[in-house]
Amino acid sequence: MLLGYSEWYKKYLFYTMLKKEFNFENDFNELDAGAFGTKYKDVKYFGIEKNSDSKLYDQVEVLYYNAENDFAIILNTKEGEQVILCRGAEGGNFATIYNNIMEKAKTYTGNKKFTKNDFLKVPNIKFNTKKEFNELCNKEFLAKDGDRCTIEQAIQTIELEMDKSGGKLKSEAAIVMTKEMALMPEEENRYFYLNDEFTMFLKEKDKDTPYFAANIQDITLFQ
């Protein structure tokens, strides 16, 4: 999206924003604060415990469960957004991790429904981060019309919140660019405990790929 430019300086600002808000059909239970990994204490959690209302079960879809540190689930929302949570992620980047999750889900033969024998623990998440992509600065490239362009600055900010009721995401990205010419525009208990490093994806239910991904390791940055 082209917001504006200067004819004299031939400078352009490209800006895009992604904004999502989602709510769970029913609030999950607020759980006791606990540890996250071996380093962090007093972390706030929500989820499902032994005496939770069974109507919460329908909000959780099991993709697979192999062990307490190897599982993936979906938290479904009223708006059709899906919160995909995974422990034991495999892959060197988010695209590979997501594809591996989907492949493991296809071959999983266990119960994909959340039952009274299952438990869920998810940390509250709240963070605001800004990243400057300095590696892109001063890089030249040719535009479609053949004009030479240079990226002066590339910035992304992300705000994410999630608790027992739902969450919201706001992601903004801006690129400042110069151009040489003016441009025209029943089973055993399963513990789905996310109490150590885990990966999170946000996806629209009818889409094939997520629109957001994060790896949660240092929980102090997210609460």
Model-derived features with residue positions:
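Hydrophobic-core positions in well-structured secondary-structure elements of globular domains
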Residues: 1-223
